[in-house]
Amino acid sequence: MNKARVKMVLLALLVFLVLIQIFQPARTNPSVIPSRSMAAHVPVPADVYTALTRSCGDCHSSQTHWPWYSHIAPLSWVITDDVNEGRRHMNFDDWEALADQKVANDRLIDICEEVKQKGMPPFSYRILHRDLRLKAQEIISLCAWSQSFRTSPPGIGFSPSHP
């Protein structure tokens, strides 16, 4: 490939990258209603709450901290999709969305397996946010708390009609 062709390809790529910035996804942080939150329905020890909000809250809450690179396409598309998927699966700030008590209980139990197997937080998040990685003691605390729901009746502490 000659130099002129390389320059043309690079220019076309640059123009493409600039043009795709027009198509930005909606990065939202819905209003938080405390009575709908997980903490209003499930007893959460302070150390577990701290670990969950710090290491999981960007995708599993309505209080996402959108970093600068989440405003640059195509990364913005991927990050927004990850956050929306995380919120759909389990949103700590909209616990009442898990209207089925068994589903809510199962999600709590699954937390331990996800963090032990390093499925959560995802690898890409852990790489970019080294300071937000779960520490060994936090994983132990999360698992002890999460697994306590195995012996509790489904939906313990969960009440869809909670005020």
Task: Show the residue positions of the predicted features.
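Hydrophobic membrane-insertion alpha-helices, especially the h-region
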Residues: M8-Q24
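A charge-rich, low-complexity, intrinsically flexible signal that marks solvent-exposed coils, linkers
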Residues: N29-I33, V115, P153
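Electrostatic cytochrome c docking/interface patches
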Residues: S31-L52
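Acidic helix-start/capping segments at beta-turn-to-alpha-helix junctions
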Residues: W66-D81
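Extracytoplasmic electron-transfer domains, predominantly the class I c-type cytochrome c fold
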Residues: W77-L128
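C-terminal capping alpha-helices of c-type cytochrome domains
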Residues: Q117-M120, R126-G157
